[in-house]
């Protein structure tokens, strides 16, 4: 029995040495094993713009106001008619498309891409303040977790100023890639931006 135990003790250090050597050999470099080939290191601005444009009809066709006024009602999801709206309906406005547009505005490849994104951002903010009134605007999308709420009148003033600057930014030589609405036509985006300015001005005149 003693001979067997001595042999086991002699083999144990060799086994441990082999284990640690093997771990050290393979722990520092796993190659591409844990690398996700579907993740990009930098944003694809054309994809961000396309994604934003696809989401725009959801803002344009909001039914919340009609439900509040009882122009029509729901059967399956009656939260809005019962004035019991999930918080995500508000917060989701800031966590999705607006972030994509802000990314293009901050890091986009040219002024035309940035100008279009500013117009779309202004449009979305107009629908947000029309739905909720006073909301975060001037401090939104800046990484501030507790942005101040701006008065709706100040938001409208800011949107008109932003749209003027956005339309003036358009007109360079940079391509508007990912544009599934106007196919990169700068003149049409300028018309849309100016039309949106007129719409907001009409709304202000009624207050």
What are these regions (language model features)?
Residues 72-178:
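Conserved, well-structured interaction surfaces
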Residues 1-22:
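Sec-dependent bacterial lipoprotein signal peptides
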Residues 115, 179-191:
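A glycine-rich, coil/turn loop motif that links secondary-structure elements
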Residues 23-95, 103, 107, 111:
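Membrane-proximal, proline-rich intrinsically disordered regions
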């Amino acid at each position: 029995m003693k001979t067997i135990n001595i042999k086991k003790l002699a083999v144990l250090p060799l086994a441990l040495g082999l284990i640690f050597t093997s771990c050290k050999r393979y722990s520092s470099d796993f190659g591409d094993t844990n690398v996700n080939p579907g993740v990009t290191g930098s944003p694809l601005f054309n994809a961000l713009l396309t994604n934003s444009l696809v989401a725009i009809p959801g803002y344009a066709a909001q039914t919340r106001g009609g439900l509040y006024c009882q122009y029509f009602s729901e059967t399956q999801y009656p939260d809005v008619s019962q004035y019991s709206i999930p918080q995500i309906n508000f917060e989701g406005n800031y966590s999705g498309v607006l972030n994509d547009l802000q990314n293009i505005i901050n890091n986009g490849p040219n002024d035309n891409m940035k100008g279009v994104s500013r117009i779309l951002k202004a449009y979305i903010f107009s629908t947000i303040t029309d739905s909720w009134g006073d909301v975060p605007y001037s401090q939104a999308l800046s990484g501030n977790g507790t942005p101040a709420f701006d008065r709706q009148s100040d938001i409208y003033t800011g949107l008109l100023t932003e749209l003027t600057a956005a339309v003036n930014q358009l007109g360079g030589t940079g391509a508007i890639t990912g544009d599934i609405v106007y196919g990169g036509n700068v003149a049409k985006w300028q018309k849309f931006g100016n039309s949106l300015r007129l719409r907001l001005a009409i709304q202000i005149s009624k207050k």
